[in-house]
Amino acid sequence: MYIIALDIGSTNIKALVLSTEIKNKEENIKLIGKVRKKTTDFTNFFYEIKKDFNIESESIECIVVTGTGASFLEDSIDNIKIFKVDEFTAIGYGGIVLSKLNEAIITSIGTGTTIVHSNLNINERIGGTGLGGGTFVGLSNIILQNRLKNNDIMTFLELIEMAKNGNRLNVDLNIGDISKNSIGNMSKDITAANFAAVNKEFTECDLIAGVSNMVLENISLIVKAVNKNDLPVVYIGTMVTDDFVKERLKEIAEYTGSKICFIENADYAIAIGAWEYYLLRHREVI
């Protein structure tokens, strides 16, 4: 039998395909594949998975779904039950299970950002912001629109490469630019004003580095503000799988005094959280 878990976001669908079998009266669950596609069409995506993995509908135990797009789905497809998991629960479960922490602030940077306090028993959204990967890609493309032809859109990976080759200090004003000393408890490395260094020379790469910093620093500061008990912060989402992004988040954490951690499969953490919830909670009562 198979279980398919999907995180249906506003721009992408991510899926996990798991096989289940009973051996010596014990169930063995194995991850056999991960799939990601830029689409919001669940039905076509589901049939593509069936075809690619050679799975018959009769052999699928359940389809576990979460994410903003899950609310648009019916309760079944091809007579297969669709089990819906609240997105905040999936975020909490994914972050806690993968980090192996007992309690943490799970920060999901997707198109926007959601902040969830979780200890598995509690999965509560405590904050969020419209800033996220969508902001980085969208605003960067707006800034670069004069160089783009035929309505081309630069991808996240292309823009990250530009940011790596840029220097945000050529477009941003830091506390250290306007004060000899730190101000209060604010480090000299904290941005005083995004894109305010208009008297400096800068490149397009500097501009994109500035956009990435604006997004990441403000997300980090919002997380710090809502993290009242100074719990560890687990970052999840596709954006935080990039080394450049992780390094910048680490730098910001140093001057905010935050404890942060990164996990493997951070880009699939919400889908993982959904099927973990299904296996650990739902199956206990059926």
Regions found by a protein language model. Give the residues of each.
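Active-site rim beta-loop-alpha module in soluble metabolic enzymes
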Residues: 141-224
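Conserved phosphate-binding catalytic cores of ATP/NTP-utilizing and phosphoryl-transfer enzymes
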Residues: 73, 81-107, 112-122, 272-280
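Glycine-rich phosphate-binding/hydrolytic loop that grips phosphoryl groups
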Residues: 92-98, 136-140, 221, 258-286
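A short acidic Gly-Thr/Ser loop motif
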Residues: 6-12, 68, 107-112, 130-133, ...
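Glycine-rich phosphate-binding loops at beta-strand->alpha-helix junctions
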Residues: 12, 65-73, 224-226, 230-252, ...
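Short glycine-aspartate micro-motif
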Residues: 3-7, 62-64, 104-108, 128, ...
